[in-house]
Amino acid sequence: MPKPKSTDALTLIGEPTFDRDGLIPAICQDTVDGSVLMLAWQNRQALEQTLATRRAWFWSRSRQELWEKGATSGNVLIVHAARLDCDGDVLLLSVSPAGPVCHTGDLTCWGDDAGPLLTRLARTIESRHDADPSTSYVAGLLHGARDQAARKIGEEATEVLLAVPGSQEQVEEAADVIFHLLVLLARDGVNPLRVLDVLAEREGLPPRALRGDA
């Protein structure tokens, strides 16, 4: 489960503008990859609780009560920053999710297809484990000799270097490098989101929670 790097309360710059019901929409965005995860509502108490605990709290309009995201499922949202839009009537919460955000089990409340490209691509590659290696190129790499999958990365990287600088060919060969790198990671049982963790930490960002289904 992700943990806040600091136990200090968050600070919100500006005064939020609540609607006639005392609510403000709060958009939750993944800190690392920028994907929009969910939208919920906060009243002043939920906002103050979020800032104080660095965990996402919301107001249920149907139940008329406060609720903490992930209190039951364990899929909490650790909040690293809270910002108001230019009009002060919409909140943006930068978060690290501890698992799928939607109650349906999807990565986002708009479905997995709305999730980050890397996650979707990794899932597609992972699904090829069950495919027939004789008819699936990816399955052949996943079940074949490791040297074969590793060699493809070198071959595609060479094509990048040989392509005309700035050309479409160079772009396409670079895409092949990334794709085959993901295949090798999947073959070795490495969640590619761990790569994002490393890059995030190098940028001074909090690492995202790893999703065990990629």
Regions found by a protein language model. Give the residues of each.
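Flexible "arm" and connector segments at domain edges
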Residues: M1-A174, I178-A214
